[in-house]
Amino acid sequence: MNLKKKMLSLAIGLGLGASIGFAGTASAEEVFVPLISKGFQHQFWQAVKSGADQAGKDLNVKVTFEGPESEAMVDKQIDMLSAALAKKPNAIGFAALDSKAAIPLLKKAQASKIPVIAFDSGVDSDIPLTTTTTDNLAAAGLAADKMAELIGGSGDVAVLVHDQTSRTGIDRRDGFLNQIKAKYPNIKVVSVQYGAGDHLKSTEIAKAVLQANPNLKGYFGANEGSAIGVLNAAKEMKRKVVIIGYDSGKQQKAAVASGEMAGAITQNPVGMGYKTVEAAVKALKGETLPKIIDTGFYYWDKNNMNDPKISAVLYD
């Protein structure tokens, strides 16, 4: 099933539709909602964009979607946010690379009565009316449980995270580490490193960790780029380790199907994009939003990746 069909079926399954849109209202003025993402290079963000674009069509809203070339480019993202706000949008969606850096600009949005909807990564502020996101603490905790099961409850493991500034980076790291500490005293985390979500940089980091830890039994990659880096490093060094990733994408799907990766946590990126735009429309209509819109997660592996509820949220 292609991404568009997956997204449409998911939207139907969630009960989403055009009923809350602006079509047929008295105002002819176009509603404009830009989304500023954490990146554009991973298939995850392309899937989020697909959901947002579909919501724009369904709800009669002009949606734009952009993000920096690298998830290390906090300053570039702030510039994009500033430029988007200068266009005086009706509302704005924002996935923060740094949970604090954008707050001054978000205060300006609030002062201008521009509703802010956070997605994927929230900010350390109550300015966003809601955050559409995965419960990353719980999701990474599930990854820790699966890792423990697969390595037999003992041994050395490592963690490779995309950053230590975004809410997702912090929560996925802490969710995994806290679960290991709380439940698995015989598992030792020997390395926690950060690769900026870049698969090339992550590969080099993972190779160094594998070289320094010949007895490593497991490796958790906390986003798509991190997981691909771990996978590439293990293949280059011909090391057999249990690899658990995050998200999906063509390379991770192939690796899980072949057994090179044990499995991964999948989010619902299409639903995340859709619900971000939907929340913006609701905010503009004066509706009260929950502080968190949980878009859900699953653990997937070669045994369940073709189940309809799993395959619907996996992307290429």
Where are these regions (language model features)?
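A residue-level marker of the well-folded mature domains of exported/periplasmic proteins
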Residues: 2-6, 26-316
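Bacterial N-terminal signal peptides
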Residues: 11-21
